[in-house]
Amino acid sequence: MMKQSIYPGITAEDDPDIEVTYPEESSSSAGLWAEVKSITRDIIFAAVMAVLIVVFVVQPVKVEGTSMQPRLENDERIFVNKFEYTFSSINRGDIVVFWYPEDPTKSFIKRVIGLPDDNIDMDGSGHVTINGQPLDESYLAPERNQAARLRWNQGPYTSGHQVRVKPHYYFVMGDNRDASNDSRSWGLVPEKYIYGKAMFRYWPLPRIGSLNSTVDVDDER
């Protein structure tokens, strides 16, 4: 008697080394449990990856205050890339997040204006010069730059006194020059205090988008 064919045209007698088995049907409860375990595993993996990304790469940040208007508004949410400066340099125009030099328990967000070895000054109208060359700051709103020069004179720097940026330090200012507590008031930011670059605004939705920007200056030293 010929044994039952497993596949059309093939029987267990065609090859004596073939062992034919018939898997038992799993119970519905066992199948459901396996599915639950699989989903749970995937959720845990995704959560772990999310934590690693937040800890080592990207951090969500809430903007508090108006010192970066009009680029950033109070209560907006942004993503900060904490990995950006591991292999790349800090550039002029970068919007950075750093530990406040006078109280490292606090974080500030400002724009990088002066790089190491730069000579910085501000003229009577509030325009910044770097190494004697004017800095293109098209991102500023003129109505928020009326008292910028006064703030310069009230800080550690006075009219006619250039700021020399030391190696491994940076000079930062808020885009809202009339309402920003920045390097004009408390000096330079150590490079080691800068821990991220503002990359993307994700809230509010109407203003969602990249925060990358550059500024131009003729770096003749």
Question: In which residue ranges do the predicted regions lie?
Answer:
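Soluble "head" domains of membrane/secretory-pathway proteins
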Residues: 2-37, 56-62, 70-221
